[in-house]
Every structure is written in structure tokens, then in C-alpha cells.
């Protein structure tokens, strides 16, 4: 590597293997004169769609069942059943023939913007069965697709023409049910819009903790917060495990309530729900606003 003085920049030539693009990630480690590691950078090589495709295949398959009652549509395959509300288009329940029901429900709801339910329809796409709801307002549609292998796919579209601190969708899931989480993405630390450095792309796993700034006992890294560039995340709960994967790049996941200040309400308020999948997150300085000044540039 070249000799680079402090505050200067330069180029490093990396002698990579001819087939390096076939790998999932690229790691670069900087070592000091004493031979000790200074830092390791990591970059995703394959796109998110290619990475997600490697975890989707499941050997067992059954025909997809679509059943309708007075309240819900139910989509079932390979022992997995999803219940979709006929009045809202939202997920209202998840069931598994081999374990207890999951309390992951009431989504996707917009964390910012308006949505007014218009209609819902059912359909088929090859071996898959579909429930699709349309909306007026900022949310355009929600489409649920059940595959024969039991994977439930969610597609949605929204458009917000406003200055908002965060954008995306949320679900409900009780924080008290969580045991641990495992994910492929940046970690192990949480991030903010203006604090994106200091995390490394890898597969991470950590036990649930409720560490908050200024309140002991401290158990770091914090379990709750905004996490960046997530490809998949596995929730390990008292009800069992479930996995959420995406082929979208640059997805943020928000885990639960992580504001540690009491008294005045922080700004901005956390997104609705307990677990969020976001395209934008707020800056850290805004959490000190307390309704007085919400300018992150002033507050830090």
C-alpha cells in the first residue's frame, strides 16, 4: 500500500482473485506497524436479490390454499398460514402447524403518510396465491403472495411528498417476547442518519437487552435501535423463530422502543408499531429536541 500522510488520501491496489465477484462480501483489513489490526472494512459484493435467493429454497412444498370467511382471507402452504383482513388488507395473524401462533401482526402500516382502504382482491400467479389490497392516499397497494414452500412475500408501494424524519412501514410484535436476533447486515451497533460509520457488514447475533443512555445496567451493543443495510433478520422469541428477508438494498430495520429520556417527549417520536422496515431514518441530534428545537444541526 502507498505511504499516506495523516489527513491525506490515496489509492490501494488490491490483488483480488479472478472469481472474487462470486463471493458474498469483500473484507479489507488495515494493519499498523506493530502488526495489530487497526480496522476491517467490509463491502457487499452480490446484490441483495442474489443474497436473498440463497436462503429462500425449501425442499418441502404443498399446494397453496386460499380460504375466505366473513372477516379474513387465509393463505396456507407447507404448514404456514397467514390471515389477511378483508377490511384493511393488513396481516392480522400468523399460524404454524408445528408451533404456536406468532404475534407478528397489524402491518404493514405507514410510519408517515395517510392510507385509506379502497378494495381487496384475490388471484393466482402460477402455483402462488395472492391477496392484494389497494388504497388512496400515500399508500398505493399491499400484495401478499404465498408460495408452495410456505414463504409469504410482501410487496407494497407508497409515495410521500413531504419532509418527514422517517419513511417505511411497521408491524406489531411484543418486545417482551424477544430472546435474541440474528441478521445479515451492518452491526453490531445501531445507527442514525448522521452516525452511519463504525459498523461492519457481517452476520451478527445478540441477546435481547434494554440498555438505554444514562440508565444502568449497561449491556452493549444495544439490542434496540435503527440497524442499516439489512438483508435478512431472524427473530428468536418465546413463540419460536421467524425470519424476514428482503431483496431491497439499503433497508433499515427499527427494533422496538429505545428512547431513554423521561419527561418531555423526544423529537421525532418513534415510528408506530414495534418493528419497522424503513427507507429513511432520523438524525441522532433530533432526539434531544424535546419539543423546543428540532434542528439536528444545532442539537448534535
Indicate where each model-derived feature is located.
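Beta-strand/loop-rich accessory regions of lumenal/periplasmic or secreted enzymes
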Residues: 19, 50-300
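Carbohydrate-binding surfaces of carbohydrate-active enzymes
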Residues: 1-83
